[in-house]
Amino acid sequence: MQLLALTLALCASIAALPTQQTPLPLEDPIKSPFPIHHSCNATEQRQLATALQETVTLAEHAKDHILRWGNESAIYRKYFGDRPSLTAIGAYDIIVNGNPDNILFRCDNPDGNCALEGWGGHWRGENASDETVICELSYTTRRSLSTMCSQGYTISEWETNTFWAGDLLHRLYHMPAIGQGLVEHYADGYEGVLELAEGNRTEAVHDSETLQYFALEVYAYDVAVPGIGCVGGEEENDGQGEEQTEEPAQDDQQDEAAEEEIPENCHTHEGGELHCT
């Protein structure tokens, strides 16, 4: 009897001892719609995954806008003229529903281009056509769509890569699995894409810059500030036009000087930003 009592007492004391638990990390709710290379650290992966989700959101809204309004949309006609909507719908739909297996975003700078001043990333081209590198600069300069139409941003006066979503949309179109050789670079800047549309040229629905501007403007008009948006420039305030007409002469001189140093695989965007493939 004493032995039984002693055994029960020992069991009770053991059961009362606190058990050591190893906390398990919570599952990250942020899932990237496209593969991210292990060279991206934990914070880069989360930022990039969130940014790619926003890119899909931007493309999906652009597609939905066209599906609902078609050529009756004034914003559609502004960017695509009288071109049929089928091609533009497909260009956005492949971002949303395309197979992501042959796409990879990485952060380890294998080609050394992130060391170049002003580079936020680049498509690897012949080195690895299915891969795009995102440089450190992107993580400190790109904005979320939640800030659309704030902090002075306007569609016409700011670069398309102000937002992660606009920048990554461009980078995705460089990849063969997405652009498929049908989406190319035909126009530069806001004025350039409008000129392309005014001529009703076929390239408008195949131009990566046009696809970015349209997606950003319909998101601003439909979502960020419904029914108003934030186009900026003369379209919002004709009184500002005279103040801005004297500046392009200096910009042209800077562009001419910059063109002498531009590598063959690069082109400049409005504002002088260099984009290389």
UniProtKB/Swiss-Prot annotation:
<feature type="region of interest" description="Disordered">
    <location>
        <begin position="230"/>
        <end position="277"/>
    </location>
</feature>
<keyword id="KW-0732">Signal</keyword>
<dbReference type="InterPro" id="IPR029482">
    <property type="entry name" value="HRXXH"/>
</dbReference>
<dbReference type="GO" id="GO:0008270">
    <property type="term" value="F:zinc ion binding"/>
</dbReference>
<dbReference type="GO" id="GO:0005178">
    <property type="term" value="F:integrin binding"/>
</dbReference>
<dbReference type="GO" id="GO:0009277">
    <property type="term" value="C:fungal-type cell wall"/>
</dbReference>
<feature type="compositionally biased region" description="Basic and acidic residues">
    <location>
        <begin position="264"/>
        <end position="277"/>
    </location>
</feature>
<feature type="glycosylation site" description="N-linked (GlcNAc...) asparagine">
    <location>
        <position position="71"/>
    </location>
</feature>
<dbReference type="GO" id="GO:0009986">
    <property type="term" value="C:cell surface"/>
</dbReference>
<feature type="compositionally biased region" description="Acidic residues">
    <location>
        <begin position="233"/>
        <end position="263"/>
    </location>
</feature>
<dbReference type="GO" id="GO:0005576">
    <property type="term" value="C:extracellular region"/>
</dbReference>
<keyword id="KW-0325">Glycoprotein</keyword>
<feature type="signal peptide">
    <location>
        <begin position="1"/>
        <end position="16"/>
    </location>
</feature>
<feature type="glycosylation site" description="N-linked (GlcNAc...) asparagine">
    <location>
        <position position="41"/>
    </location>
</feature>
<feature type="glycosylation site" description="N-linked (GlcNAc...) asparagine">
    <location>
        <position position="200"/>
    </location>
</feature>
<dbReference type="GO" id="GO:0008237">
    <property type="term" value="F:metallopeptidase activity"/>
</dbReference>
<feature type="glycosylation site" description="N-linked (GlcNAc...) asparagine">
    <location>
        <position position="127"/>
    </location>
</feature>
<protein>
    <recommendedName>
        <fullName>Antigen 1</fullName>
    </recommendedName>
</protein>
<dbReference type="InterPro" id="IPR039124">
    <property type="entry name" value="PRA1-like"/>
</dbReference>
<comment type="similarity">
    <text>Belongs to the ZPS1 family.</text>
</comment>
<dbReference type="Pfam" id="PF13933">
    <property type="entry name" value="HRXXH"/>
</dbReference>
<dbReference type="InterPro" id="IPR024079">
    <property type="entry name" value="MetalloPept_cat_dom_sf"/>
</dbReference>
